[in-house]
Amino acid sequence: MLVLSRKLNEAIQIGDDIEVKIISVDGDQVKIGIDAPKHIEIHRKEIYLAIQEENSRAASISNDLLAKLSSQKK
């Protein structure tokens, strides 16, 4: 993991298209701004993990349903 220090209003560039800027610092809370193309999905980590879990659950249900449907056709 690359660890970088930034001050207020300083930024980090990721590739050609993504900029991460420090917007404010208030105690232990840091607000960042992310400028990225619209096709790049950006989520807080806990939201991303919840999305992944829900997608896995939905895929599992779909596979179970597909298996039941194919066994009924026989």
From Swiss-Prot:
Record-level GO BP terms: bacterial-type flagellum organization; mRNA catabolic process; negative regulation of translational initiation; regulation of bacterial-type flagellum assembly; regulation of carbohydrate metabolic process
A Pfam family: CsrA
CC annotations in GO: cytosol
Leader sequence residues: none
GO terms for MF: mRNA 5'-UTR binding
Subcellular location(s) per record: Cytoplasm
Keywords: Bacterial flagellum biogenesis, Cytoplasm, Repressor, RNA-binding, Translation regulation
InterPro entries according to UniProt: CsrA, CsrA_sf
Family annotation (NCBIfam families): csrA, PRK01712.1
Function: A translational regulator that binds mRNA to regulate translation initiation and/or mRNA stability. Usually binds in the 5'-UTR at or near the Shine-Dalgarno sequence preventing ribosome-binding, thus repressing translation. Its main target seems to be the major flagellin gene, while its function is anatagonized by FliW.
Family stated for the protein in its record: Belongs to the CsrA/RsmA family.
Quaternary organization: Homodimer; the beta-strands of each monomer intercalate to form a hydrophobic core, while the alpha-helices form wings that extend away from the core.
Protein name per UniProt: Translational regulator CsrA
